[in-house]
Swiss-Prot record:
Sites where the protein binds Ca(2+) 1: E60, E61, T76, E77
Keyword Cell membrane tagged: yes
Keywords: Autocatalytic cleavage, Calcium, Cell membrane, Developmental protein, Hydrolase, Lipoprotein, Membrane, Metal-binding, Palmitate, Protease, Secreted, Zinc
Protein name (database record): Sonic hedgehog protein
Family: Belongs to the hedgehog family.
Domain remark from Swiss-Prot or TrEMBL: The sonic hedgehog protein N-product binds calcium and zinc ions; this stabilizes the protein fold and is essential for protein-protein interactions mediated by this domain.
Organism lineage string: Eukaryota, Metazoa, Chordata, Craniata, Vertebrata
Pfam families in the cross-refs: HH_signal
Residues at which Zn(2+) binds: H91, D98
Length: 121
């Protein structure tokens, strides 16, 4: 009570490291596959658009800007319907995103992954 918590040190994720430590398609990481969502399905209406001006969507979070001033989160893929992912991809349900940074600096990806985990993704 009344004491301010010190922010914990962020440890970058290693290449191919998962949180939780299971692959994204497993039950423990993402739950059961519920089926592809198409524009004409009822579940499409449940998807929530994101209009955050701090995110650069490929079709051209503030935590990224705090970590690296002047750098923005760049989402390259979210909900998708084009069929180029594996059959039960979470992209078809709107439950997966592919992200990078606006400067496309791959050395930031481990910390970016950690930021995503810390923010509930």
């Amino acid at each position: 009570y009344g004491r301010r918590r010190h922010p914990k040190k962020l440890t970058p994720l290693a290449y191919k490291q998962f949180i939780p430590n299971v692959a994204e398609k497993t039950l423990g990481a993402s739950g059961r596959y519920e089926g592809k969502i198409t524009r004409n399905s009822e579940r499409f209406k449940e998807l929530t658009p994101n209009y955050n001006p701090d995110i650069i969507f490929k079709d051209e979070e503030n935590t990224v800007m705090n970590q690296w001033p002047g750098v923005k989160l760049r989402m390259t893929e979210g909900w998708d319907e084009d069929g180029h992912h594996f059959e039960e991809s979470l992209h078809y349900e709107g439950r997966a995103v592919d992200i990078t940074t606006s400067d496309r600096d791959k050395s930031k990806y481990g910390t970016l992954s950690r930021l995503a985990v810390e923010n509930g993704f």
